[in-house]
Amino acid sequence: MRGVTETDKLANGIFHLVCLADLEFDYINPYDSASRINSVVLPEFIVQGVLCVFYLLTGHWFMTLLCLPYLYYNFHLYSKRQHLVDVTEIFNLLNWEKKKRLFKLAYIVLNLFLTIFWMIYSALDDYED
């Protein structure tokens, strides 16, 4: 479950960057790019919330603490209604959006590696007992 949601978020982040790169190189129009990105934003937020709750319920406190800043950031964007990409502003904010998505992608990759590490550590610890 943990690895699946982390890889879903990773694929989602890569999808966002590909859409923005396609827009930058004029392979896609702004409306299509914004609608593609906006269609996966809320599922990304839901997956992050479920993952954080899953870590909390299973007693993985360290991973819960690592997921909380990203969850807070997503909640903050959603509450200020800044979570969706605006079609009319997408060209003006293209570099900022790409930087934001790259930072989120790096954060997700770090969480993925830590999740894999803790799964292997837990499996080896159970094997020794």
UniProtKB/Swiss-Prot annotation:
Question: Alphabetically, which GO biological process terms does the record hold?
Answer: vesicle-mediated transport
Q: Which InterPro entries match?
A: Cornichon
Instruction: Kindly list the residue ranges recorded as spanning the membrane.
Output: 45-65, 105-125
Please provide the record's keywords in A-Z order: Membrane, Transmembrane, Transmembrane helix
Tree of life domain:
Eukaryota
Major place of residence: membrane
Per its record, how is this protein called by name?
A: Probable protein cornichon homolog 2
* Source species of the chain: Arabidopsis thaliana
